[in-house]
Amino acid sequence: MEGTGVVAVYGNGAITEAKKSPFSVKVGLAQMLRGGVIMDVVNAEQARIAEEAGACAVMALERVPADIRAQGGVARMSDPQMIKEIKQAVTIPVMAKARIGHFVEAQILEAIGIDYIDESEVLTLADEDHHINKHNFRIPFVCGCRNLGEALRRIREGAAMIRTKGEAGTGNIIEAVRHVRSVNGDIRVLRNMDDDEVFTFAKKLAAPYDLVMQTKQLGRLPVVQFAAGGVATPADAALMMQLGCDGVFVGSGIFKSGDPARRARAIVQAVTHYSDPEMLVEVSCGLGEAMVGINLNDEKVERFANRSE
């Protein structure tokens, strides 16, 4: 796709493109996390537990989503000093969250040497109308989506990884399942379209035509797609992998549980062996109490996923 900087092609675990571009490098860095688990941590000790459990990366933040829900207030970028301490404590990549549209928070995170930035709806929005222009940054961005249109709009802005929005901090997987099924369902419809129908479909999605066509040709998103929002058990993680995700984010589900280290190891094993029921039985046994979840049928529960489009 000339001029788009978008890469394709998934094959044998490698992205191939004749012409290298800064965006292709970022997508390649994100693809290195495929098949892994990214864990939310609030201090160096938790980061070390995550690394020892086999996490492929950690997300450094001052409050996990469950605490953001419980405490309320404005949720902002974490203290850079705390992020630096976590970076010094582990050898795996470290991510951090910036508010949607807050490009200065992203500039600060890039300046302290963070490996990936999550432009996150879990934090309070800084701009209701504009996301960050992620092409202006050297490091890869992660963005959430509820459907194919949102995913492709974020990729056009420069997102190198897409995740389901789900409902972070609830321990309830239903919204993450809804979002990944929505994306995959639209891709199945797209694959069966004639090429001359794609223009109308792209217009319906409010997504760039070239990315819609590329998705049709690939049969999947042109960047890695992780599950996030409500993953609390090994079974949840395996479910999202069987639904076609490339990896899993786990936030409150680990360190709000009764035995974080054991649950962290179990979720990593579940992602690795997601299609092996016998292994899933083994890793699901004796984990202690899971995090207390939130019933999303309660109208009083704030929907983080609806904060942006």
UniProtKB/Swiss-Prot annotation:
One of its GO terms (molecular function) is pyridoxal 5'-phosphate synthase (glutamine hydrolysing) activity. It is found in: Cytoplasm; Cell membrane; Membrane. The active site is at K97. D-glyceraldehyde 3-phosphate binds at R181. The keyword NADP does not apply. It catalyses: aldehydo-D-ribose 5-phosphate + D-glyceraldehyde 3-phosphate + L-glutamine = pyridoxal 5'-phosphate + L-glutamate + phosphate + 3 H2O + H(+). It is an enzyme of class 4 (lyase). Disruption phenotype: Plants have a lower leaf carotenoid and chlorophyll a and b content, and are impaired both in root cell division and in root cell elongation. Mutant rsr4-1 can be complemented by the addition of any of the vitamin B6 vitamers, except pyridoxal 5'-phosphate. Induction: Not induced by cold, salt, drought or UV stress, or by abscisic acid or jasmonic acid. It comes from the Eukaryota. Pathway: Cofactor biosynthesis; pyridoxal 5'-phosphate biosynthesis. InterPro entries: Aldolase_TIM, PdxS/SNZ, PdxS/SNZ_N, RibuloseP-bd_barrel. Homodimer or heterodimer with PDX1.1 or PDX1.2. Interacts with PDX2. Vitamin B6 is an essential quencher of singlet oxygen in plants, that can protect cellular membranes from lipid peroxidation. NCBIfam families: PRK04180.1, pyridoxal 5'-phosphate synthase lyase subunit PdxS. This is Pyridoxal 5'-phosphate synthase subunit PDX1.3. The gene is PDX13.
